[in-house]
Amino acid sequence: MAHDEQWFTPRLQTAATLCNQTPAATESPLWLGVDLGTCDVVSMVVDRDGQPVAVCLDWADVVRDGIVWDFFGAVTIVRRHLDTLEQQFGLRFSHAATSFPPGTDPRISINVLESAGLEVSHVLDEPTAVADLLQLDNAGVVDIGGGTTGIAIVKKGKVTYSADEATGGHHISLTLAGNRRISLEEAEQYKRGHGDEIWPAVKPVYEKMADIVARHIEGQGITDLWLAGGSCMQPGVAELFRKQFPALQVHLPQHSLFMTPLAIASSGREKAEGLYAK
């Protein structure tokens, strides 16, 4: 099912409002999606209408360049999210959808969820998850995460090309740490609350990302470019990409941090309809 901006914009707002808060009341069947990111782990629950009803988020350094390097830490976070959600809803989540960066082994994400006590109902790469949610035509999807940037080309709702580049929010933090002479951990915290202030220092990194995207989408004949991922929430990113790609319609939804988790949870709802919390 195709979803336009009127469909997902309020859902992203709802996800942001519910993040680590009391879940929304619902009697609907519920589906769980787990996004294992470089800087965060997000578990999102959606109802039959694809509306987020609960969101758990932990900032965590458990994934680097698309690889789970702290397996125990990742499992611990997912298990904690699962325990929280099951206690809040009084239901058992036996299945969840998840994703992986293009070009990496999906078994990495699957193993984390299985070790946390979940069966994986559906798995797909990150930009494909967003592309499936939007059901685009002649468009590119750029998912700028913490450690990687996923790029997908979509024609008539089908992903015809995907790639992953080892650049993302982690590299922004490295640049900021060097610029301000602070630790990487301090830089991670600082960038979340000082977006306008840090833009001059980190803009060159985003310019490099845009150059990388340009190489991947060259000659693909797309008309629209959709940006997703938490690293896109930096003020200045949308304007930079619009200047880099003046011939394209560049879209950046608010609260893009939750776009991939919403896409993952929605894929579980649409592709594994009978596997919901009971």
Question: What would you call each of these model-derived segments?
Answer:
Residues 1-38, 42, 47-141, 158-165, ...:
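Nucleotide/phosphate-binding catalytic cleft detector across ATP-hydrolyzing
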Residues 141-144, 149-154:
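Basic (Lys/Arg-enriched) interaction patch that binds polyanionic ligands
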